């Protein structure tokens, strides 16, 4: 763990003033900021500098000078964003306040990626100070998640645009200088390239406005490419317009928009609409006169079907190009000068070191199944094989295998929504109406009204207030926003009705009847279904705003509520694309690992019924969920806000809590955890590593999922399935089963990374189960990984392993789900601590938590795991079911998403090769059966040659020999042997016992 260097005593006393002097000098001399702004920034700096000087700081840099620079940037960014939001843009006239985030970073010699990586630590520490200075809604006004998402999207889109431009156009007008796919990225890109990007940025500012989702922005970029193809002089073209294999013909001419729609997987209707917006933008901003392309004669339009196209004379002529670029540059500068946001021109600047080369999520940015750092503008050679390279078109449009990218994957998923869901009727089908009308009373009208209100809350329209606030924007901006919101509401509504009908059919078969009154009259169930549908629509379009958990806040449900429907939703929508299934499963993982355990979760309401012994602790900590806001309350907020974003979270927290004791349910853990996976949860899809948890859903659970009607029934109601359980007990049993499955995956990953024995794996797993069952309160307000990490260290101590907490944390950092906040900020209630020297709630590092909270509670359970641990110490204060708690189950077999058999005719599997499988699979007698990517199968060979050999064997017409060959290097492996070898064998959960020690912080 890299932590801040300790400050010297002189720095802590007499050096404090010099710290403020350096900050003031940085503001005034380094950035030429105005006096009023410097005064406000100095106020925040002085209020927070004790945190900078604290020995407990955890910003991941080494030198004190580096720490200061980060802190300077964080303070200035926060003040810039929050003071402007508070003042309502009243400081626009003060030139000393007109600066962007990029200017601050350049002054501090930092890059964007490192800024986003360390910002959560600043927010965690300075959050209370920001709340005191700027109000409780400071985090939403700061918009860090949105800014980070925007950066990720633009990183992808800029690579997408650069690749497409280099395929379509030359760097110069000389045809001999055509760039190849392997040419150097240092090639100078002409003004046409910059013009296109600036036009795209102008489109984002003036037309897309609030809803800058990835799909809409991709349509915008493709529209810009169309403008360039029409107007860039023919001598710069790198394509032949007569190439029938690349372009769609309409008669004897090329249909340009249809061609681009096919190549880049866009909707041709959306492309036409966006083209109209671009044309209007050029007319208004560049003062160019539009002409019907069909009435204009120019070499650029030869062999193009000009129907519906617009042409601007002199738009790309060299005499006018510089002026147009300058106009767009000024327009963009004016638009961002006082917003403190990113200067999005950095993505096409020649000097792009400001972008950085780090990563943004748990050590790596997870994009479409690969971990990839943000590169500077990658060379064509790199992007050809990169999974981040844009859709390879037009040259590869007809290729059998085109590598998927985040952008192309998003467009493919959007096509599913457009072709499968959009054509459906925006009302209940006849079959669904039959179920709705078969209840004790007809609930059709209720279902329709609820859907309208909830989806309006999730996808609000722009109100008159926003129309006025959009000064300087085109008049069509608000109209575009409203059209976007209406389209998304319609898609979510149709998906909701479709899945609801399928679920009703399945439930009726379970219950042997059409009367589903208990389910179809359950308000919470319907809101969960609507939230799930809306989240899929948002995930498909990859929005910058309304990131998860926005759907929870706007529908009034909790994480525990949503976790009940995700599995059923996936199961009952068979057409759901694989990437959306992954998205829902990644959400479920996020819900289970921490969000369900946070204050205000409805899980605690069920847990208090299922485990009465925990009720007092749950009430003491104020963990119970508040009543769900009524539909009328949500509708009122929609109407009062005139379509602006309704402040439902405050309604949920305050209006329905007259005693005022619950207050803000957000914990520092939640604040920071939301930044760790902006890319994973929304801006890209989860990796196959996460699919290990999805695969666990196939493991037979001890507690089968209950029927939906019982999952959403009152916690105290008897389970209609029998067994003498209440619905709360059934729900908690199912929930605990999911937690144990998720823990099994993560424990196994750490075991493999630490190269520990299967016996240790079994012991850690047994301990985790015991803690969940008998020390459930240790999970309250915490992340399950915190319990897992402490369990590893506790088991290491009783097993006399030479394993330090530092080694555990270092290896945890390499896990795909790692969040630094897990070990940097653990909730503690000092009233329950071993050394009760402080009072109240606090957040400490994981070693302090282990010593003060974990070991005093778990030590008896650790002793029980040892052969001789059944005499000295017994557990006499179980949280759960008492001494009669069921014996922990052995470690389950964890199927990988692989092995994947390539085809029925080839005896070839593809599977991740873990260290635990290596010895079993790669023996001397069977080595030729396996090809390890990155490790040659023969001497002096390369991985690329290995892959060529594999492909040739799979694709070639190999003649089978008539005689059997018993040579070592020949033969086949049976399917059963391969399948069985890929499952880890169960071990023994017993291990020798040693004295349970506490961990000392390591220097």
UniProtKB/Swiss-Prot annotation:
Pfam families: DUF3452, RB_A, RB_B. InterPro entries: Cyclin-like_dom, Cyclin-like_sf, RB_A, RB_B, RB_fam, RB_N. GO terms for biological process: cell differentiation; negative regulation of cell division; negative regulation of G1/S transition of mitotic cell cycle; regulation of DNA endoreduplication; regulation of transcription by RNA polymerase II. Keywords: Cell cycle, Nucleus, Repressor, Transcription, Transcription regulation. One of its GO terms (molecular function) is RNA polymerase II transcription regulatory region sequence-specific DNA binding. Signal peptide: none annotated. It is found in: Nucleus. SUPFAM superfamilies: Cyclin-like (SSF47954). The keyword Oxidoreductase does not apply. It comes from the Eukaryota. Transmembrane segments: none annotated. Belongs to the retinoblastoma protein (RB) family. Regulator of biological processes that recruits a histone deacetylase to control gene transcription. Formation of stable complexes with geminiviridae replication-associated proteins may create a cellular environment which favors viral DNA replication. May play a role in the entry into mitosis, negatively regulating the cell proliferation during leaf, stem, and flower development. Critical regulator of the endocycle. This is Retinoblastoma-related protein 1. It comes from Nicotiana benthamiana.
């Amino acid at each position: 763990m890299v932590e801040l260097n300790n400050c010297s005593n002189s720095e802590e006393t007499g050096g404090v003033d010099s710290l403020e002097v350096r900050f003031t000098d940085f503001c005034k001399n380094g950035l030429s900021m105005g006096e009023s702004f410097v005064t406000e920034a100095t106020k925040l700096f002085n209020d927070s500098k004790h945190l900078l000087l604290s020995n407990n700081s955890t910003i991941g840099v080494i030198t004190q000078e580096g720490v200061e620079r980060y802190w300077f940037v964080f303070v200035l960014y926060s003040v810039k964003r929050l003071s402007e939001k508070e003042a309502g843009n009243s400081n626009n006239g003060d030139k000393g306040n007109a600066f962007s985030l990029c200017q601050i970073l350049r002054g501090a010699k930092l890059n964007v990626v490192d800024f986003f990586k360390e910002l959560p630590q600043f927010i965690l520490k300075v959050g209370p100070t920001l709340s005191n200075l700027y109000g409780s809604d400071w985090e939403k006004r700061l918009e860090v998640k949105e800014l980070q998402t925007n950066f990720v999207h633009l990183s992808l889109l800029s690579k997408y645009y650069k690749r497409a431009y280099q395929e379509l156009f030359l760097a110069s007008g000389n045809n001999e200088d055509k760039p190849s796919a392997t040419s150097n990225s240092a090639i100078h890109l002409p003004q046409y390239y910059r013009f296109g990007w600036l036009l795209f940025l102008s489109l984002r500012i003036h037309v897309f406005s609030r809803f800058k989702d990835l799909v809409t922005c991709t349509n915008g970029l493709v529209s810009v490419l169309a403008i360039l193809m029409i107007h860039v002089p023919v001598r710069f073209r790198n394509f032949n317009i007569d190439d029938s294999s690349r372009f769609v013909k309409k008669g004897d001419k090329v249909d340009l928009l249809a061609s681009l729609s096919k190549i880049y997987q866009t909707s041709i209707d959306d492309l036409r609409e966006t083209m109209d917006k671009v044309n209007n933008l050029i007319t208004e901003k560049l003062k160019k006169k539009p002409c019907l392309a069909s009435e204009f004669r120019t070499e650029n339009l030869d062999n193009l079907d000009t129907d519906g196209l617009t042409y601007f004379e002199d738009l790309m002529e060299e005499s006018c190009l510089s002026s147009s670029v300058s106009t767009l540059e000024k327009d963009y500068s004016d638009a961002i000068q006082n917003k403190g946001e990113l200067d999005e021109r950095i993505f096409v600047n020649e000097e792009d070191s400001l972008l950085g080369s780090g990563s943004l999520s748990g050590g790596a940015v997870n994009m479409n199944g690969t971990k990839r750092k943000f590169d500077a503008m990658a060379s064509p050679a790199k992007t050809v094989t990169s999974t981040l390279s844009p859709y390879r078109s037009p040259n590869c449009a007809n290729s059998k295998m085109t590598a998927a990218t985040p952008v192309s994957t998003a467009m493919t998923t959007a096509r599913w929504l457009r072709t499968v869901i959009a054509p459906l009727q925006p009302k209940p089908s006849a079959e669904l109406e039959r179920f709705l009308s078969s209840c004790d009373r007809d609930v059709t009208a209720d279902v329709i009204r609820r859907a309208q209100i909830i989806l309006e809350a999730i996808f609000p329209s722009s109100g008159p207030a926003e129309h006025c606030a959009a000064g300087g924007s085109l008049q069509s901006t608000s109209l575009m926003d409203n059209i976007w919101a209406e389209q998304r509401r319609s898609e979510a509504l149709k998906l909701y009705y479709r899945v609801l009908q399928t679920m009703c059919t399945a439930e009726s078969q379970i219950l042997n009847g059409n009367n589903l009154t208990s389910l179809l009259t359950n308000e919470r169930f319907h809101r969960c279904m609507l939230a799930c549908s809306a989240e899929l629509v948002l995930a498909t379009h990859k929005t910058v705003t309304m990131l998860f958990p926005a759907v929870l806040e706007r529908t009034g449900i909790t994480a525990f509520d949503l976790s009940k429907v995700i599995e059923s939703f996936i199961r009952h929508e068979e057409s759901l694309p694989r990437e959306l299934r992954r998205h829902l499963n990644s959400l479920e993982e996020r819900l289970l690992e921490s969000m369900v355990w946070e204050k205000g979760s409805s899980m605690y309401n069920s847990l208090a019924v299922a485990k009465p012994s925990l009720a007092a602790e749950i009430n003491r900590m104020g963990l119970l969920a508040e009543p769900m806001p009524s539909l009328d309350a949500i509708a009122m907020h929609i109407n009062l806000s005139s379509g602006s974003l309704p402040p439902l979270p405050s309604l949920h927290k305050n209006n329905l809590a007259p005693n005022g004791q619950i207050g803000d349910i957000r914990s520092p853990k939640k604040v920071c955890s939301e930044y760790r996976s902006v890319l994973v949860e929304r801006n890209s899809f989860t990796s196959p590593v996460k699919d290990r948890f999805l695969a666990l859903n196939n493991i037979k659970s001890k507690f089968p999922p209950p029927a939906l009607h019982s999952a959403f029934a009152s916690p105290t109601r008897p389970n209609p399935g029998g067994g003498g359980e209440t619905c709360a007990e059934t729900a908690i049993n199912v929930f605990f089963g999911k937690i144990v499955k998720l823990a099994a995956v993560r424990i196994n990953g750490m075991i493999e990374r630490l190269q520990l024995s299967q016996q240790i794996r079994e012991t850690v797993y047994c301990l985790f189960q015991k803690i969940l069952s008998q020390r459930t309160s240790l999970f309250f307000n915490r992340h399950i990984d915190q319990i897992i990490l402490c369990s590893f260290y506790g088991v290491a101590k009783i097993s006399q392993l030479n394993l330090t907490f530092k080694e555990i944390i270092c290896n945890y950092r390499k896990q795909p789900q790692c969040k630094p906040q897990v070990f940097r900020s653990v909730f503690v209630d000092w009233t329950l601590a071993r050394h009760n020297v402080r009072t109240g709630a606090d957040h400490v590092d994981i070693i302090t938590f282990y010593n003060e909270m974990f070991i005093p509670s778990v030590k008896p359970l650790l002793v029980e795991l040892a052969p001789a641990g059944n005499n000295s110490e017994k557990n006499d204060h179980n949280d759960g079911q008492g001494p009669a708690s069921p014996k922990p189950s052995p470690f389950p077999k964890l199927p990988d998403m692989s092995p994947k058999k390539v085809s029925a005719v080839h005896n070839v599997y593809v599977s991740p090769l873990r260290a635990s499988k290596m010895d079993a699979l790669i023996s001397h007698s069977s080595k030729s059966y396996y090809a390890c990517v990155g490790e040659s199968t023969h001497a002096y060979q390369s991985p690329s040659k290995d892959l060529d050999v594999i492909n040739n064997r799979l694709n070639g017409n190999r003649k089978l020999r008539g005689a059997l060959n018993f040579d070592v290097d020949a033969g086949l492996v049976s399917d059963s042997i391969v399948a069985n070898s890929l499952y880890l064998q169960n071990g023994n959960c017993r291990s020798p016992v040693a004295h349970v020690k506490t961990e000392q912080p390591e220097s």
